Amino acid sequence: MTQDKVLTKAATDAVHQLHEADVLFAITSGRPPRGMQMLIDPLDLHTPIAAFNGGILVDRDMHTIEQKAIPPDLVGPVIDLMKSFDLDVWLYRGADWFVTEPKGPHVDREAWTVKFDPSVVDDYDHLSDQVAKLVGVSDDHDAIQKASEEAHEQFGDHVTAAASQPYYLDVTHPDANKGFVARYLAKQYELDEAEIATIGDMPNDVLMFAHSGLSIAMGNADPQVKRAARRVTDTNEKEGFAKAVERFVLPAARQQPG
């Protein structure tokens, strides 16, 4: 998708070329399930849809296949850590999105992106069970990076913490990450990880790269994301996804036996 979160015709056509070549196509995102629903029909998706970076997997009818929640006893401490870096905090639970500051940074943009509005609450004290994702939000990108590093330091392997955008820090269950999604799909479809191609542009895509034979970074990705990938395509404003499918994925698929 473009910087303005628009699904282009070239990207849609590229996915349909994958279908025609009998290449399975799946999507994973930090978005909630409802925030990915608008992609199902245009992309003719029939594979599991991995929302919240793998925190919830749903089918095309939005029925839950699998769900992984943040340990309830860590929800409060993670929120406190985010606040210590002056991040606004969003909480996702099931299909719902909660905020305490409806006029906070990026709330309106996120509502436009996911096509639904958040529920406004005074605090999150009563919402510690079944939390799929916590998001720290700030336009201070250094604060996002430092909060991510501190989350790794404080919580270790008990959560996954990674930036899904320069201004978003996503915290999820330790197995709710895009690496888990790649492993899950490999098992589901009896594939070797070497047969999987992944395309991404954010730090939360790096774990996914590690579990695929062909990893492709978008041209708009940060340098560390590009270094983690085997190939680099054009930017999302210059049809980088469609070019990656044409230049890398389809030729690799044609070389597969059978």
Predicted regions and their residues:
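Asp-based, Mg2+/Mn2+-dependent phosphohydrolase catalytic module
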Residues: 211, 216-258
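Residue-level signal for inorganic ion chemistry
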Residues: 18, 29, 53, 134, ...
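Active-site phosphate-binding/coordination module
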Residues: 4, 9-107
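Phosphate- and divalent-cation-binding pockets in alpha/beta enzyme and binding domains
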Residues: 35-38, 146, 181, 207-208, ...
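Conserved acidic, metal-coordinating active-site core of Asp-based
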Residues: 85-211, 220
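A generic structural signal for well-ordered alpha-helical segments
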Residues: 18, 82, 152-154, 225
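Short, structured coil segments at secondary-structure junctions
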Residues: 43-45, 52-53, 60, 155-157, ...
